[in-house]
Amino acid sequence: MSVARTVLITNRRGLHARASAKFVTLASSQRCDVQVEKDGSGSVTGTSIMGLMMLGAAMGDSITISANGDGADEAVTRLAELVEAKFGED
């Protein structure tokens, strides 16, 4: 099963190192493959801090979180909620 959801980055510092680390920790705990894409510029694995940071997602940018495999729906929901909660910042 493949699921995708687009979310808006709303925390002031965007997808920086600490936010990326929180995302990777959660993505790594999922049973499915997680990918993240910004502006159709190609996707990166959701378990790579450097990959996420290389997206350059700043406040006001949208990212698309997609997952494929067992638990994909739950994984995308949980990761989207993390982003929407500003990674616990602000």
Enumerate the language-model features and the residues they cover.
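C-terminal structural segments of small proteins and small subunits
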Residues: 56-90
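Compositionally biased, disordered extreme N-termini, encompassing classical targeting presequences
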Residues: 1-3, 89-90
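Intrinsic-disorder/low-complexity, polar/charged segments enriched in Ser/Thr/Lys/Arg/Asp/Glu/Gln
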Residues: 2-6, 62-64
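Compact, glycine-rich, soluble single-domain proteins
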Residues: 8-51, 55-58
